[in-house]
Regions:
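Flexible beta-edge/linker motif
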Residues: 1-82
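Short, surface-exposed polybasic-and-hydrophobic patches located at secondary-structure transitions
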Residues: 57-63, 85-110
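Amphipathic hydrophobic-ligand
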Residues: 13-27, 67, 83-97, 113-123, ...
Length: 169
């Protein structure tokens, strides 16, 4: 099935903190009966993170109500200063697998539109049957929104290179 959404917003008590425009979703809704959200493709013309959401007090963790499987997703991601202290615009592509009671895996690539060469690449796998794998590479030559989103100074050069593997106990 294909679904299209012209405008999607997510809000909390302070108002809208995420806005997505012109979403297209190709998914298998029958999988919901198996407690799985399964999408072949999710794409949006743009997704704006306007500010950080407020987090309500957390109750007892009951786990995820369903597994998430996204074969391919892509968008133009806009990080506003209210979210990352400096505006950033990125072309983002990723895939995602999150099991209700188990492993998580994603590969993500974000390339800056405003500052060519600035990027974030992530390959993450944890839990489930396989070993832990974390490979992260990011660079903002003059600082930027990725550093700001991580709580670091957005106006200083930022470099991240992480390689980890092993097991979780």
């Amino acid at each position: 099935r294909d679904a299209r959404i012209r405008r999607l917003t997510i809000r909390d008590e302070k108002g809208v903190w995420l806005e997505a425009n012109n979403l297209r979703l190709t998914w298998r809704y029958v999988e919901l009966f198996r407690r799985r959200f399964d999408a072949d493709l999710i794409e949006a013309q743009s997704v704006r993170l306007i500010r950080r959401p407020t987090l309500a007090p957390k109750g007892k963790d009951r786990g995820l109500p369903l597994s998430l499987h996204i074969d391919r997703a892509r968008t133009r991601l806009i990080l506003e200063p209210g979210f990352s202290y400096e505006r950033g615009v990125y072309d983002v592509a990723f895939d995602l697998d999150v099991e209700r009671r188990g492993g998580r895996r994603t590969k993500l690539a974000a390339k800056s539109v405003l500052h060519p060469g600035d990027h974030l690449d992530l390959d993450l796998a944890m839990g489930g049957n396989g070993p832990l794998r974390v490979v992260a590479d990011a660079e903002e030559a003059s600082g930027g929104a990725i550093a700001g989103a991580l709580g670091l100074s957005p106006d200083r050069p930022f470099r991240l290179d992480v390689r980890a593997n092993g097991t979780l106990s």
